[in-house]
A protein has these predicted regions:
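A short beta-strand element within beta-rich, extracytoplasmic domains
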Residues: 80-90
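Short, aromatic- and glycine-rich surface loops/edge beta-strands on solvent-exposed regions
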Residues: 126-131
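C-terminal motif of bacterial Sec signal peptides marking the signal peptidase cleavage site
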Residues: 7-11
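Transition segment at domain starts
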Residues: 16-74
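Edge beta-strands of jelly-roll/beta-sandwich modules across compartments, strongly enriched
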Residues: 95, 132-145
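Short, solvent-exposed loop/turn segments in extracellular or other extracytoplasmic domains
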Residues: 109-115
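Extracellular and analogous surface-interaction loops
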Residues: 63-65, 71-82, 117-123
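Short, surface-exposed beta-strand/strand-loop-strand elements in extracellular ectodomains
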Residues: 91-106
Length: 145
């Protein structure tokens, strides 16, 4: 079992929430940005916990303010099917979680939504990214194969 806790307090410049306090959708980032490897990120107050045991990964990623894109999990399995359960709670700003494999967006999970889905595994790596624009957000995930 691997358990990681981290706390990050950094001073940084953030992307302004230009679509208002009641709209949590991304206003600045487009799909090509997500696939283009824009991974620079400004984060404040990050608390992360995760565990991987055999064919299962679980975790929580909580940040008081994030602007940019950060990878929160990478999962690989030799099983035929992988099941993802991802919950995104955004209190401020804009946020989106994307699952990417082989430079393709597999799923998008919008702010304040929960989604369970399965993928047919092709022995690829599946990466979960959090994208935020001045977002206060918590992501919880459970992956099983």
């Amino acid at each position: 079992m691997l358990l990681i806790f981290s706390l990050t307090l950094t001073s940084c410049s953030h992307i302004e929430d230009i679509n208002g306090p009641d709209d949590y959708s991304l206003a600045t980032f487009k799909d090509e940005d997500l696939l283009g490897g824009i991974h620079s990120c400004s984060e404040m107050g990050v608390i992360e916990s995760s565990s991987k045991i055999l064919d299962k990964a679980t975790g929580t990623y909580k940040v008081s303010k994030i602007s940019g894109m950060t990878e929160i999990e990478e999962y690989r399995s030799n099983k035929d099917t992988i099941t993802f359960n991802i919950e995104v709670k955004c209190e401020e700003g804009n946020a989106l979680v994307v699952v990417i494999s082989n430079n393709e967006i597999i799923k998008k999970i919008e702010a304040n939504q929960s989604l369970t889905f399965e993928v047919s595994n092709n022995d690829e790596s599946y990466r979960i990214f959090l994208v935020g624009e001045s977002a206060k957000v918590t992501v919880k995930y459970n992956i099983e194969s």
